[in-house]
């Protein structure tokens, strides 16, 4: 199939933004987006095929699908030089592909008069690639979010991993697994920001189970994600300021307040022997984005539920036909390496 994604109304016009001002008076301010009358709708070409299979009187079901989409004329706001009087300009700047697989499996291992046990499993994986940007217009990278670490679009030939959702930031220098130090303090990479990870997971999935025994029901639902990265500025500030429990490891009970860090002195090429104040070392070590980027993999217990359906004979002399009582909990536990 082929579809066109158009802009929202008035996005190509040089209109004013109306807001509520001081004292209830309305104010009108100029739009900070430079109007582009030549912009075209995005073009999306998609392919998908799959199958739905049932076996053993539908006690085993498999639903699988493969898809691929190609998006051209991507509409992205491009940051302008402030001297232009505008912040951004919407432009058609590239091509991006997505392809992946989605799988659902349903199984009923046990089914008797009084007991039934069912399992359901789902899995999905998507591979994204930024094929091209507007290199002919001097646009080889686009920063979508920039505060500390940066969420950027880059192709593979611009020191990027070539996929949507990539994180870039500053990082400490390691050589042969050894932290590089100068004057006893960690050395931070100078120059272009390095690749930290991608916010999108490698794959996601879920597992659910249901038990039914006579009038009782019990169900559990798990969700899981493998891969992906998450950036936490809270972690950086908490470690630098000593407000996180992990920062206790840096404190000296004797009050000496000095540390000889494990690493290589860049000036001598030998093991570091320079002692520096702990406070200075901690602030230098945690003043980079790499240290606050974590693997976003997780396993979640999304829901537990237990229920009981009252026997119909108990309702015989009432206007009620069915009554069920349930207790459930949602988002009960999460297992992950991301710090709280």
Predicted regions located by residue number:
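Glycine-rich, aromatic-lined ligand/substrate-binding cores of catalytic
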Residues: 198-233
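Short glycine/proline-rich turn/loop motifs
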Residues: 29-30, 186-190, 281-290
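A short local loop/turn or secondary-structure capping micro-motif enriched for an aromatic residue
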Residues: 71-72, 189-190, 227-229
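Conserved small-residue
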Residues: 91, 108-199, 239, 250-251, ...
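Extracytoplasmic gating/loop element in the C-terminal half of outer-membrane beta-barrel translocons
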Residues: 227-324
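Extracellular/periplasmic, surface-exposed regions of secreted and cell-surface proteins
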Residues: 1-154, 288-340
């Amino acid at each position: 199939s082929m579809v066109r994604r158009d802009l929202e109304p008035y996005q190509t016009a040089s209109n004013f933004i109306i807001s509520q001002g001081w004292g209830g008076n309305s104010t009108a301010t100029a739009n900070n987006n430079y109007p582009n009358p030549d912009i075209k709708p995005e073009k999306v070409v998609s392919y998908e095929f799959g199958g739905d299979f049932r076996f053993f009187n539908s006690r085993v079901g498999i639903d699988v699908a493969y898809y691929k989409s190609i998006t051209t004329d991507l509409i992205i706001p491009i940051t302008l030089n402030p001297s232009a009087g505008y912040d951004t300009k919407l432009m058609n700047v590239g091509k991006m592909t997505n392809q992946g697989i989605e799988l659902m499996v349903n199984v009923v291992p046990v089914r008797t008069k009084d007991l039934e046990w069912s399992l359901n499993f789902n899995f999905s994986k998507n591979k994204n690639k930024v094929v091209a940007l507007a290199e002919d217009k001097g646009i080889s990278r686009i920063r979508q979010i920039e505060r500390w670490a940066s969420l950027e679009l880059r192709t593979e030939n611009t020191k990027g991993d070539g996929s949507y959702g990539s994180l870039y930031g500053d990082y400490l220098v390691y050589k042969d697994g050894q932290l590089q130090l100068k004057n006893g303090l960690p050395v931070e990479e100078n120059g272009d920001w390095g690749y930290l990870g991608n916010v999108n997971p490698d794959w996601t999935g879920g597992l659910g189970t249901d038990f039914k025994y006579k009038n009782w029901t019990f169900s559990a639902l798990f969700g899981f994600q493998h891969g992906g990265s998450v950036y936490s500025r809270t972690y950086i500030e908490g470690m630098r300021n000593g407000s996180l429990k992990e920062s206790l490891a840096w404190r000296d009970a004797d009050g000496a307040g000095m540390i000889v860090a494990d690493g290589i002195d860049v000036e001598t090429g030998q093991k570091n022997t320079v002692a520096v104040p702990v406070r200075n070392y901690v602030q230098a070590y945690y003043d980079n984005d790499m240290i606050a980027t974590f693997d976003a993999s997780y396993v979640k217990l999304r829901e537990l539920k237990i229920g009981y359906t009252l026997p119909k004979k108990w309702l015989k002399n009432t206007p009620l036909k069915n009554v069920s009582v349930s207790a459930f909990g949602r988002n009960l536990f999460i297992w992950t390496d991301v710090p709280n």
